Amino acid sequence: MITKPDKNKIRQKRHRRVRGKLSGTADRPRLNVFRSNTGIYAQVIDDVAGVTLASASTLDKEVSKGTKTEQAVVVGKLVAERAVAKGISEVVFDRGGYLYHGRVKALADAARENGLKF
């Protein structure tokens, strides 16, 4: 019997593989992206201390209107502003195993425009 591969399991496997090579420090934390069917979530994480330094998501009150891509742009802007306010200017971008396209790319571009370097 032919079975269809589970896209999320493949993404999780890809994410685990990339996370083995990618890590955030206090000087250059990791900007992690998680994308669900309804929302998008971004966190700036110091992996050495195991602490989230800044975060933003579509659950925030500032991000209620628009298409999913427009919401991703607002989330990118918010996470960048919150990170810059805490003195973080450079990050390592972790796309979470997703393709660098669509909502993930929109979030990354908005974060770059608002002061994060990666």
UniProtKB/Swiss-Prot annotation:
The keyword RNA-binding applies. Residues 10-20 have a biased composition (Basic residues). The keyword DNA-binding does not apply. Residues 1-24 are annotated as: Disordered. Pfam families: Ribosomal_L18p. GO terms for cellular component: cytosolic large ribosomal subunit. GO terms for molecular function: 5S rRNA binding; structural constituent of ribosome. CDD domains: Ribosomal_L18_L5e. GO terms for biological process: translation. InterPro entries: Ribosomal_uL18_bac-type, Ribosomal_uL18_bac/euk. Keywords: Ribonucleoprotein, Ribosomal protein, RNA-binding, rRNA-binding. Part of the 50S ribosomal subunit; part of the 5S rRNA/L5/L18/L25 subcomplex. Contacts the 5S and 23S rRNAs. Belongs to the universal ribosomal protein uL18 family. This is one of the proteins that bind and probably mediate the attachment of the 5S RNA into the large ribosomal subunit, where it forms part of the central protuberance. This is Large ribosomal subunit protein uL18. It comes from Streptococcus sanguinis (strain SK36). The lineage of its organism: Bacteria, Bacillati, Bacillota, Bacilli, Lactobacillales.
